[in-house]
Amino acid sequence: MRYTFNLKTLLLAALVAVPFLFGNLTAQEAAPAAAPAEAAAPADAEPEAGPVDDYLELVKSSGAEYAPAFDFFTVSMLWTVIAAAMVFIMHLGFATLEVGLTQSKNTVNILFKNSFIIAIGIVSYALIGFNTHYPGDFNGWLSIGAPIGDLNADGGSGWGYGGLALAMTGYGDFIFQAMFAATAATIVSGAVAERVKLPAFMIFATLLVGLAYPIVGSWHWGGGWMGGLNGGNGFKDFAGSAVVHAFGGFAALACVILLGARKGKYTKDGIKPILGHSMPLAAVGVFLLFFGWFGFNGGSVLSAAPGPLGLVFTTTALAACTGALGAIIVSWIVLKKPDLSMTLNGFLAGLVGITANADIVSATGAMIIGLIAGIIVVFSVLFFDKIRIDDPVGAISVHGVCGVWGILAAAIFEVVGEGAEKQFFLGGQLMGVLAVALAAFVFSFVVFLILKVTIGIRVSEEEEHEGLDVAEHGAPAYHIS
């Protein structure tokens, strides 16, 4: 049987090879003898048709109504939706990281919150967020948008929002930005884990991603007042160190202040660590986030332009890795042992730090930015623990503090070309990120305070002790007999 199969395979290969063999022989026979030298083509000569041109001409001559155009716009649009899918995967990373760094009795609750966030995030962004985020001409501070309409209307290369030319359709831009919108609430989810009331969090998350995030984002990405910063050069926040990460981080800080620490975390004898139940899950979550970040930053190029895209991928990877190395070194010195959770947060700190400036810094600059972010995150986590701000996953430090660092780093490490002038300065960058942080903090504090005095924001001590899987959902994540 094996012999028969091989014989058939050889016969089939021979049949396939015959046309190529005769084609090559014919081409060789038809080719003229080598000439001493051919005359140079005139400067204005038409370029020879390539295989793609031949294919398009063949399709056109066949009477077909549609022929794919392999052009820059098409490739850019394809890259945008791929990047959106990569950012979507980040939400699985956030959920897995949060589950791993918390107690097993709260796993179902955390997964439910993250599932709700992505669902309400995309829907609310479609109903109000997108056209609030990109309102076009407005007064620079506040403009509430309507639900999305036909985003293909007048679509094409060069069509966009707020005067921004995009190499994508309106729908492509919407789905990419919608993935960003849900991220802010996901950051808060990790910080308030294990003791927040589910209904209160759901109301808060809806208002945050549907209203607050797009309003603040419009100040920068929607043609708002931040365009006047840095001497008219605008606020530099390439992919969202401020308007996504610092926004989420300082929103989380406000919520944690009102919510309080988990029971037993801080005692008269000092700080009692509440260990996460699965470091493998936490590690998987971080590497999913690392992967998705290539879409987060790479998609923010808003096209498939090879130069910027390659630079952004490189600076993103370098900053993440030096962030991890910085966290490893510092945590080993300070804690006397290599700490995996600090290392994982070091990766994320480097990624947050480079998100503002990935397109304007050098490879060396990216490594320094990531290294400093990794050092910052260790001291920041320890600082918040010391002042009894209980953040189970380190979200405030990773996203809030390192988000601020990324914005300032854009001014410090900006590469200025020969003959060009510096565009971004510490004063303008600091003003922009403080405005974002203050807006996020005040909005979140007010909303969470209203929820606290009305429906309540914290579960009872009994429910917290039992675990929110059973208390809120009536079902544990793990059935261990």
Predicted regions, residues:
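Bacterial N-terminal signal peptides
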Residues: 11-20
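Hydrophobic alpha-helical transmembrane bundles of multi-pass membrane proteins
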Residues: 5-9, 23, 27-481
